C-alpha cells in the first residue's frame, strides 16, 4: 500500500488521532511493548472510551502507521510509523549541561595523547555508554593529509613501504622491489615522493604524481621511477579507498532486553555486518549527504537492513570543513531518538574540533 506524503498524512489526522498515535509510539520507545485500547484510555490526558480508541487505531492501521503483532495484542508502530513520528513529532532539545561536559571531558582527555585512534575510540565508547546502544566511528584514510613515505628493505627483493599521516597514523605495506635496486635508490625514490606528496591526501598525491612532466620524471633513473610508481600504487588495491578504520564499542548493550528468537536473529545479522565491515564506505556517503545528524530506520539503513536496526549518524570534519569520517549510534528501532540525536551531534562537533 502506497502511503500519502508526510504533509498529507499529518493533515489527515485529527488531534485525537495524533495523540493516540504519539502515545503508541512513545510507549513502544519506552518499553518495546504493544499497547492496547484500555491502557491508552488510562494514559490519554482526555477521556475516551476503549471503543472510540479502537476505531482510531483501526484508521491508523489502515494508513500503515501501526500494526498488531498478534491477533489479540495491542498495537506497535510500523517502520513507516516510526519514520513519520521522527519527521513530524520528534522534539529534539539540547543535551543537559552535565552530559555536554562529560562528553567533552572524556573525548578531550583522549586527545591529550595526540593519537587520533584514542580520540575516535573514546568517542565511540562515550556514545555507547550514554545511549545504551553500540557507538561506532568510521574514518576514511584517503581524506587524511600525508606527511611522508619511506622504504625499508626487508630482503634483497622486498621492502616495507611506510606511509605516515600528518595526524600521526602509520600504515605499512610489503612491496616487491625492482631487480637490482640499491639502497641509495630506495632513498632517492622516497625523497622524490616526499617532495611531491607532503600535505596532500592520498588521492591528491596520486593525481599530483600523474601530472608531473616527463622532464621532472627524468630526475630519477628507471629503477627509482618504478619504485615511485609502486610506492603509492600499493595503496590503490582492493579496499584502499574504503574506510580504513571502523571502531565499534558497546555491542553487549544490544543484548539487553532481547526476548524473542526473532530479536536474536536480527542481532546475529547486525554483528555479522559489523564484523565484516562490508560496504562501510556507504556510511560516509550517507553522512556526507546531509548537513547534520541523519536517522535511518530499519530497511532505510541499507548497511544493516536485515538486522532491523536504527542508525543515528553525523559527519565530522577537518579544518577545511571536508567530511573525513562519521560517528553515531546503532541499536534497536526503539532508540531514544530525542536524546541520542543531540548527543551524536555534539560528539561530532567535539571530535571535529580536536582533529583540526
Curated annotation (Swiss-Prot):
GO terms for biological process: negative regulation of DNA-templated transcription. It comes from the Bacteria. Keywords: Repressor, Stress response, Transcription, Transcription regulation. InterPro entries: GAF-like_dom_sf, HrcA, HrcA_C, WH-like_DNA-bd_sf, WH_DNA-bd_sf, WHTH_transcript_rep_HrcA_IDD. The keyword Repressor applies. GO terms for molecular function: DNA binding. The keyword Lipid metabolism does not apply. Negative regulator of class I heat shock genes (grpE-dnaK-dnaJ and groELS operons). Prevents heat-shock induction of these operons. Belongs to the HrcA family. HAMAP family: HrcA. This is Heat-inducible transcription repressor HrcA. It comes from Brucella canis (strain ATCC 23365 / NCTC 10854 / RM-666). The gene is hrcA.
Amino acid at each position: 500500500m502506497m502511503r500519502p506524503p508526510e504533509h498529507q498524512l499529518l493533515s489527515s489526522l485529527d488531534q485525537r488521532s495524533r495523540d493516540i498515535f504519539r502515545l503508541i509510539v512513545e510507549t513502544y520507545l519506552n518499553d518495546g511493548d504493544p499497547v492496547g485500547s484500555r491502557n491508552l484510555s488510562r494514559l490519554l490526558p482526555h477521556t475516551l472510551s476503549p471503543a472510540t480508541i479502537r476505531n482510531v487505531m483501526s484508521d491508523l492501521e489502515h494508513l500503515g502507521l501501526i500494526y498488531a503483532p498478534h491477533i489479540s495484542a495491542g498495537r506497535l508502530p510500523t517502520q513507516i510509523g516510526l519514520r513519520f513520528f521522527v519527521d513530524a513529532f520528534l522534539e529534539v532539545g539540547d543535551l543537559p549541561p552535565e552530559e555536554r561536559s562529560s562528553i567533552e571531558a572524556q573525548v578531550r582527555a583522549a586527545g591529550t595523547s595526540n593519537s587520533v585512534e584514542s580520540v575516535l575510540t573514546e568517542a565511540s565508547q562515550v556514545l555507547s555508554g550514554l545511549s545504551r546502544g553500540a557507538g561506532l566511528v568510521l574514518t576514511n584514510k584517503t581524506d587524511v593529509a600525508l606527511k611522508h613515505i619511506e622504504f625499508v628493505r626487508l630482503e634483497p627483493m622486498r621492502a616495507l613501504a611506510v606511509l605516515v599521516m600528518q595526524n600521526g597514523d602509520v600504515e605499512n605495506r610489503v612491496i616487491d622491489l625492482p631487480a637490482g635496486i640499491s639502497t641509495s635508490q630506495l632513498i632517492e625514490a622516497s625523497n622524490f615522493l616526499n617532495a611531491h606528496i607532503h600535505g596532500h591526501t592520498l588521492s591528491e598525491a596520486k593525481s599530483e604524481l600523474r601530472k608531473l612532466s616527463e622532464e621532472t620524471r627524468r630526475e630519477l633513473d628507471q629503477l627509482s621511477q618504478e619504485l615511485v610508481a609502486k610506492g603509492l600504487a600499493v595503496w590503490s588495491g582492493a579496499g584502499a579507498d574504503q574506510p580504513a578504520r571502523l571502531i565499534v564499542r558497546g555491542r553487549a548493550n544490544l543484548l539487553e532486553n532481547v526476548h524473542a528468537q526473532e530479536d536474536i536473529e536480527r542481532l546475529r545479522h547486525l554483528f555479522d555486518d559489523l564484523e565484516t565491515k562490508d560496504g562501510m564506505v556507504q556510511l560516509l556517503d550517507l553522512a556526507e549527504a546531509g548537513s547534520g545528524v541523519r536517522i535511518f530506520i530499519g530497511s532505510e539503513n541499507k548497511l544493516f537492513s536485515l538486522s532491523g536496526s536504527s542508525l543515528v549518524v553525523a559527519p565530522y570534519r577537518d579544518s577545511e570543513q571536508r567530511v573525513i569520517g562519521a560517528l553515531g549510534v546503532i541499536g534497536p528501532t526503539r532508540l531514544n531518538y530525542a536524546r541520542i540525536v543531540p548527543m551524536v551531534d555534539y560528539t561530532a562537533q567535539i571530535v571535529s574540533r580536536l582533529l583540526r
